[in-house]
Swiss-Prot record:
InterPro entries: Ade_phspho_trans (IPR005764), PRibTrfase_dom (IPR000836), PRTase-like (IPR029057), UPRTase/APRTase (IPR050054). GO terms for molecular function: adenine binding; adenine phosphoribosyltransferase activity; AMP binding. This is Adenine phosphoribosyltransferase. It comes from Bos taurus. The keyword Oxidoreductase does not apply. GO terms for cellular component: cytoplasm. The lineage of its organism: Eukaryota, Metazoa, Chordata, Craniata, Vertebrata.
């Protein structure tokens, strides 16, 4: 890990064993948000990756409820794009589409407004962390229901032992930091 910006972000990630339930090692991104320099570095690193991987092909960044909302708008702003929200069920007005998913420590449902995108628009999904892949997989399913093209999913942290990347199938995935 030679990149100084990446080192800065990595130093800000904290670990909490047995949270929120026994057996889970929680990776806390709060210190990244608290430190404007490390937050800016995380956005720069993700934006640089997306510029190299996709150039100007991205139409929207989709932020996942709730910590994806912390990174999605800033990343979209950095790239000169709009940000759409994929929320937990019951949080969006108007007609929506819904998908169920399993989490590392529970179950849930996500939804998106039916008019959030036009068919064929290209989207990158962002969240703070990839664990089992359930949330990102559900987000990709929702975007597919709207006939959008998911170019890639990205996160700050990936928990590799939970193999969430595999759940995404053919959708490319990128993370800044990987932990067992």
């Amino acid at each position: 890990m030679a990149d100084p910006e990446l080192q800065l972000v990595a130093r800000r990630i904290r670990s909490f064993p047995n949270f929120p339930i026994p057996g889970v090692l929680f990776r806390d991104i709060s210190p990244v948000l608290k430190d404007p320099t490390s937050f800016r570095a995380s956005i720069n690193l993700l934006a640089n990756h997306l510029k190299k991987a996709h150039g100007g092909r991205i139409d929207y960044i989709a932020g996942l409820d709730s910590r994806g909302f912390l990174f999605g708008p800033s990343l979209a702003q950095e790239l000169g794009l709009g940000c759409i929200l994929i929320r937990k069920r019951g949080k969006l007005p108007g007609p929506t589409v819904c998908a169920s998913y399993a989490l590392e420590y529970g179950k849930g449902e996500l939804e998106i407004q039916r008019d959030a995108l036009e068919p064929g628009q290209k989207v990158v999904v962002v969240d703070d962390l990839l664990a089992t892949g359930g949330t990102m997989c559900a987000a990709c399913e929702l975007l597919g229901q709207l006939r959008a093209e998911v170019l890639e999913c990205v996160s700050l942290v990936e928990l590799t032992s939970l193999k969430g990347r595999e759940k995404l199938g053919a959708v490319p995935f990128f993370s800044l930091l990987q932990y067992e």
